[in-house]
Structure formats: C-alpha cells, structure tokens
Amino acid sequence: MTFTGSLDESWFYLVSVAIEARAGPIVPMMLEAIGAARRGDSNKVVECLRHFAERLDELGGLLERMYETCDPHVFYHRIRPYLAGGKNMADAGLPHGVMFDDGTGEQPYVQFSGGSNAQSSIIQFFDIILGVEHRPTGETRSGGSVTEGGSMQTPAHGFIMEMRKYMPGPHRRFLEHVERVANIREYVASRRNNRALVTSYDACLAMLRALRDKHIQIVSRYIIIKSRESRSHSRSLSPKQAASQRLNLANTLQRGNSKKLRGTGGTALIPFLKQARDETGEPAIDAWARRLLNNGPGGIGIADGVATLGKMNEHLTGEVEVVGLAGTWSVDDSEGGVSSFQTCLAQT
C-alpha cells in the first residue's frame, strides 16, 4: 500500500528497507567489538572494524540503486508532498502545522516532522559506535553558531537528537545505552602505534563519510535540480496559469525573501547534510587521515602547516557549484533536500 501506487514510491521505500536489513548484522558485531575492547583484544576489534567498513561500502552501493527505478520527477512532484510533514512548513502554507479533524471542532494544530530515515536507529548507531559527534546545524566546533549578522549563539539541540523522539522507545533507549558504553574510539586512540587498529578505524570513518557524500548527490539530483526546474517553469507561466497551479506542500514558495526548501523532516537539509558529512571525519586518529577526511570547502588552505585542497567545486562559503550539460547551478546553503535515505543520512 503506497500513497501514489507507483513503482517509484515502492522502490523508494524498498531501498531504505534494504539498507536497514543489510545493516542489521552490524549491531551485534560492533557490540562484540565493544566487549573485545574491554578485554584488550585488539585483533578482534580490528576484525570487527574491517567487516564494518566493508559493510558500509555495501550500503553505499545499495543507496545508489535508488536511481534504478525511482524517477526524480516522480519523486519530487508526486511522492515527496506526502512525506513533507507539518513542522517548519510555513513557507509551504502550513504556518501552524496541521489539524486532524475529529468532528468536535476543538482539535488544536500540531506540528510533526515528516517521515525521515533520520528516525532510523541504525545510522545513529554507526555514529555512536565510531565516536562521531554531531552539533546542531550551524554550530561551530567551538560550541556556538553564527547568525546572519555574524554574531554567535548557542542553539538548543540538533536535528538528529530531535528525530529520536520519533523512534520506538526501545530503539531510543538502546541508543542511549550504547552511548554510555561505546569505547572504540578511545580504545584506538590509546593504541596509536597499532597500525592495523588505526587504519581499520579510520577506514570506517572514510566509508561512512563516503555514504553521506552519496546521499548528498542523491539530494542534489532528486531535490535541488528538480526544485530549480520547477522554479524555472513557474516563472514561464502567465499570472493566471500560476494562480491555478496546485500547491505542492514540499515545494518552495517565494514569499518575500523566503526561499527555504525544506526536507521532509522539516529542516533545511543541505547545510545539515554537509555539516554531518564533515563531522564524520573529525574523530580520525591518523593525522594524514584526519586532514584528508576534514578537508574543508573550496580552494587551497593551510592546516597544521600542510597545504590542503578543498572539496571539488565547493567554495569557502560552503556553496556547491555543479557544472553540467544544462549549465551551471549552485546549491544554496538555505535550501534543503529529502530527509530520508534520499534523504537521511543522517538522519535522520
């Protein structure tokens, strides 16, 4: 049973479920690694980390299968509106969220995030096991976030923690318990001379970061490009035609200076996903791996006295420029994406 009855929608869900199923065995394996670290069994920890890295690489391959049967046009215009939710959707015509009419006339408006695989416990489990810490979107490593005026502020908590509220209670409590017992990063850091241990740990970070890179590419193809095509089409319509266009709850509405394209989880996901990707490399143990995984956006810079080259076509402002057959377009930091595996990773 799907909203649209389309194979595209079924495939969208199927890929997400396949990732969950393939990732499932990682949980007991890495819990075993935690126990091995407590016993000081480095060989077992290395074995588990190597299998973890290989499985993460497989998950990236599954994620890329989204392209096979889920058409970006169908996803953006037909499927995504049903996943939009009612939180932070004022620009889409839902300033107060949604109201579930029970016939009494007294029901309040409620605001809930749309369906998002950021609500999946498995991706958050990966981060916890590897010691990856995610800050609220826009917050720097020093603990504050930069406002438009350049001042610093400290946000409450991040989107990833918010999504735990949508998890089944046992899943949420399991993650909280794993946070208390996770020891892999500390164990590896205390044995830096064990090259096999350090390399296998850093390889896991690299594979998880690559998975998030692939997700950003999917967001760009399924959301950003389709959003720009939709805007271009809207500008070509006459005022009468434009007024008759059906409102797409998941699309951008141009109201004043507002142009935020929200993800289905209710957040602007491009800055969220970029920051989550960059944070994934921060715990790397080896200095060279850390420089490689934390390579900042755009151009050439200096880190620890070593010249670094930024991510391809990503400027110092964080803006990503893509050059293709249809010309040049850029991913604005204020725009979002899907909040699912063509969405999550995250998240959600």
Predicted regions located by residue number:
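Surface-exposed peri-terminal alpha-helical interaction modules
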Residues: 1-348
